A protein has these predicted regions:
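N-terminal accessory/capping or targeting/presequence segment of soluble
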Residues: 1-110, 122, 126, 130-205
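Nucleotide donor/acceptor-binding cores
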Residues: 115-117
């Protein structure tokens, strides 16, 4: 049962109004951050803000007539409890017969739409493989993927800022190896692969 007094019901309706004003058919809200961190900073807890789900893995899709949370087996019970009264449906992943977000959008939400479909994503937090999967799911049909990383800023008035915590250096008594030694080994590895550089994006790496 959807509870009209539920704060998340109101937030989802606000997202839908914003979508209408921008000509967006569906918005995909990532539960990750630009570094694909398992535990993102408060600024990127967009899924929690919009539907109340606090699990570490989950993405939300909102259309004008459906809102759904995609999460895996670790969080099924938690999701059912936290989504109660929000009107957000639980879509289970990592199970036989799962329907991933791109397939659901193409084959269910907009199966009868042959005109252009506009999808909003946070391009900073979605990997290129996911964008490719979206495009492939729609095949020859027209789909516009809009990169709107700060779309919720218009609604999330007290959204936390990007963290500016000072960087600290851990001593060798904790790391077991100096920074220079690690960089030296990494450069030797790069040379051995005949590469010029390596891109490291995960914060814990």
């Amino acid at each position: 049962m959807i509870l009209e007094s539920n704060v998340y019901v109101r937030r989802i309706e606000a997202v839908r109004s914003l979508m209408s004003s921008k000509g967006i058919d569906a918005v995909i809200i990532s539960g990750s951050d630009p570094h694909a961190s398992e535990y993102p900073a408060s600024r990127w807890k967009q899924v929690e803000w919009v539907c109340g789900f606090t699990g570490e893995a989950g993405d939300v899709v909102i259309t004008q007539d459906h809102a759904g949370l995609w999460t895996d087996t670790r969080y099924f019970i938690q999701a059912e409890q936290q989504l109660a009264g929000t009107g957000v449906a639980l879509h289970k992943t990592r199970i036989p017969g799962e329907v991933r977000i791109p397939q659901w959008l193409a084959d269910y939400a907009f199966a009868d739409r042959w005109g252009s479909v506009a999808l909003a994503v946070d391009g900073l937090s979605q990997p290129v493989s996911f964008i490719n999967e979206l495009e492939n799911a729609f095949g020859c049909r027209q789909v516009r993927i809009l990169d709107l990383p700060d779309m919720l800023d218009d609604l999330w008035m007290d959204r936390p800022a990007v963290p500016a915590t000072p960087v600290i250096t851990l001593g060798e008594d904790l790391t077991g190896e100096s920074r220079l030694s690690k960089l030296g080994r990494l450069r030797s590895f790069i040379d051995g692969k005949n590469c010029d550089a390596i891109l490291v994006t995960a914060l814990d790496e």
